[in-house]
């Protein structure tokens, strides 16, 4: 029976989460997941949220605001999945701000400069509402902020391109407040192969990537294996001397053939390593039906481009996508689907090794029916 269909296991899970307060266990489940699954009242949800420390390890706010500087996430702004009022309503204590570097920037140059801009942007968000928000660089900061009634914004880099082949940049970004680095993103880079890139340049990690891991270990920056090819993920687990994380991934067991997700053996290995797997909320990450829909859309767009000799920036592609989506409604996942991924990590690696990495503001309009925003 699926984890989400076993209330007694869910209750034990909640009780265990309430008792855990160690450094790695600040990576807890959101109240909305637990309380909705248990059909608790709104007041019960709020009470639970106040009793535990809730952390989401991956939210793509900075790049959204960078592209649309008119957005102010310290006030209500429903153009995206995240803003401060909804963060407070959901009881989220700490939201890792993703310093996302697109692969196109990596190829064109300027990755480090963009990372600096995005980090400064996060500091700018905090400066707008210092009585409500604070930058966090360690677990103690998050606990202190919680007691003071402040929401925490720790930071992680998504795509290691800003390292730019220079190990000195590891300490540089640590001083800037970065506490994890996702080694690659949608394409292989100078550090690692990507799960999305069919051209595997390195057979896993590059030689520089194998040097980078110990440097990150020494600086106290967590190594994030989300987005990596299988070979790269296994090599990280072999090389790293400290626990690794998957900041926003899900399980391949439920979506066979989707290499962006983790295998059961990887989950077990992360647990043995002492790390944490944070579950991504995107529907196409958590159900095979949604992934099939996405694959079919990609194939249809590719065929349409080739038939009409269009490039990737042609505006007619947007119209084609919208029309196709109207004719083929997207099969949104539900809360229970996300819970099943969480439950399987518990079964495979133990309760100490599961968390959430929602990917809010990063997976577009594919969020599950019951998890549409951070509230």
Question: What spans do the regions from the language model cover?
Answer:
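Short hydrophobic/aromatic-enriched beta-strand-loop microsegments
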Residues: 243-249
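N-terminal hydrophobic targeting/anchoring segments and the immediately downstream early-domain regions
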Residues: 41-202, 252, 256-375
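Active-site glycine-rich loop that binds ribose-phosphate moieties when present
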Residues: 203-211
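Distinct, well-ordered alpha-helical segments
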Residues: 166-170, 232-242
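Bacterial N-terminal signal peptides that target proteins for export
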Residues: 8-10, 16-27
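Substrate-binding cleft of carbohydrate-active enzyme catalytic domains
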Residues: 214-225, 229-235, 266-272, 344
